[in-house]
Every structure is written in C-alpha cells, then in structure tokens.
C-alpha cells in the first residue's frame, strides 16, 4: 500500500505539532500525526539521560546507592531544579527520582558528569545511543533539554527512546509514578527536606498512567512522553509542542484512550473447561 494508506486514518486529530502512540511491547505505531517533524523537546530529553544512567548502573559502572558530590557547574544549571549546592552529596537513586519527578536540571548534569566525566562527553554518548536506536530525527546538545540551537527530536523518536527505557528498565516507572515524595538535602549546614511533586498531572487524572517525562520551554511549548497500562497492555503516547499544559495532557489522554479502545490482548490461556483431561 502507498505509505500514506498503511495506517487507518484515526477519527481525530490532536492540537500538538507532533504526536505518536506506540504499543510498548511490540513497538507497533497505533497513531501518528507529523510523527517525524523535528522539534525542540525541552526536558523530555531526560528520557535519554535516564536511559544512559540506567545503562551505567546495569554495567556496574555506578550503583544507585553511590553518593555523588555536586559540581559547581551542576549546581548552577537554572531552570527546574532541586537547588543542589556545590559539594553537596546525593545518591544516584535520589537524583534519578528528582530528574524523573520534577525534571531537575542540576541532578541531570550531576548524573551526566558522574557517568561520562563531563556533560559534553555524556552528550556524545546520547547522540551515539540515539543513532543506535534509529532515532533519525534527533540531535542532542545537552543532558537537560534547556534551549539550545539544533537540540531537536520527533514524536516518533521520543517513543523509541521511551520504549527502550521502560522495556529494559521498568523500575524507572516506580520513580516516574511518584506523585509526591520528600528527599533529603545534606550539606555542611545540616540536612533539609525537599518535597518533589510530579510535573505529570495525568498521574492523578488518567487511570493506569505511570508517568514518564514532561517538558516545556517557551520555544518547545508543552511536550510529554506518557506511559499507561491497562489490562496487561502498555502504551506510550508522545506529544510535542502542544500550546498549553491542559492541551498537552488532553492530547495524550485522547491518544491513550484511542489505543486502549483498539487493543485487544490475545493470550494463550485456554479456559479451564476446555483443557484436555
């Protein structure tokens, strides 16, 4: 069939400039709208950052319990952050949680430096990993998603890296599904609590949502990679450049609803009474 006819035309459109819905298990694309349009992705970048950190844990290079000393550069990142101070120490696990839940730029850079020695070296690895995953619409310039010329991806590529992250490291979903949690800052002045509140409002409003990653800047508008699971089916909805936060979450919910209404999970379970004696 001609390229444009392969997929049945969905009965709706989303307001986002790029969107895709993927079955997490098979990788099948269930819906797409401008799925390969190259756009800035803001903090959804951190899906790749988290993937590389989890791979470093997996390979034994670092552990989740390792304590990391925060560099001056990581502490100075600006944007969404948990206000880490230079020379403060925090575990890889707590920093991953802060990246996932509140999109902490300071933690993202500290983790990048821990894994690769510098954010620049880490970014090289991000681009290498993107190429390995077939993310042809993607180029990373930093580990945070802070605005940078030429830092782009597509809705399709977001789904690719999200699928790789959650299929290989499903434990990340225990971080991304945290709605609210305290983490402790320990500095020379003593310890203090910092409350993380998740940036993904679908966690509260969409049944089965397990979070993953939001992103927004004035340039990128409102982006999201959302994972939801119902009846044994896991879907990934990727939305880019929605005009406002409400539309971003509404578009993602519409995609997920469409997917769950289309998906029937076939299992090999034979009803008890049909089994041979």
Where are these regions (language model features)?
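Active-site-adjacent loops and short helices of periplasmic peptidoglycan-processing enzymes
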Residues: 2-156, 162-167
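Domain-terminus/edge residues, biased toward the C-terminal soluble/receptor-binding domains
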Residues: 135-139, 147-277
């Amino acid at each position: 069939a001609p390229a444009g006819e392969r997929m049945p035309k969905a009965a709706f459109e989303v307001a986002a400039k790029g969107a895709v819905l993927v079955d997490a298990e098979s990788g099948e694309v269930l819906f797409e709208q401008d799925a390969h349009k190259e756009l800035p992705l803001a903090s959804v970048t951190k899906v790749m950052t988290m993937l590389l950190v989890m791979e470093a844990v997996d390979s034994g290079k670092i552990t989740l319990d390792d304590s990391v000393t925060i560099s001056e550069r990581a502490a100075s990142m600006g944007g969404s952050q948990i206000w880490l101070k230079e020379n403060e120490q925090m575990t890889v696990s707590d920093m991953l949680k802060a990246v996932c839940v509140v999109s902490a730029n300071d933690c993202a850079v500290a983790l990048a430096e821990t894994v690769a020695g510098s954010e620049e070296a880490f970014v090289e690895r991000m681009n290498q990993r993107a190429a390995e995953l077939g993310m042809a619409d993607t180029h990373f310039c930093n580990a945070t998603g802070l605005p940078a010329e030429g830092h782009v991806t597509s809705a399709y590529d977001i789904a690719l890296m999200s699928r790789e992250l959650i299929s290989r490291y499903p434990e990340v979903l225990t971080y991304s599904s945290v709605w609210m949690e305290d983490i402790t800052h320990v500095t020379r002045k003593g310890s203090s609590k910092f409350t993380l509140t998740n940036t993904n409002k679908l966690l509260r409003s969409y049944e089965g949502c397990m979070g993953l990653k939001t992103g927004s800047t004035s340039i990128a508008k409102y982006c999201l990679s959302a994972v939801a699971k119902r009846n044994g089916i896991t879907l990934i909805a990727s939305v880019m450049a929605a005009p406002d936060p409400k539309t971003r979450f509404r578009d993602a919910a519409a995609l997920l609803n469409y997917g769950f209404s289309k998906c029937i999970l076939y299992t090999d379970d034979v009803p008890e009474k049909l089994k041979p004696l």
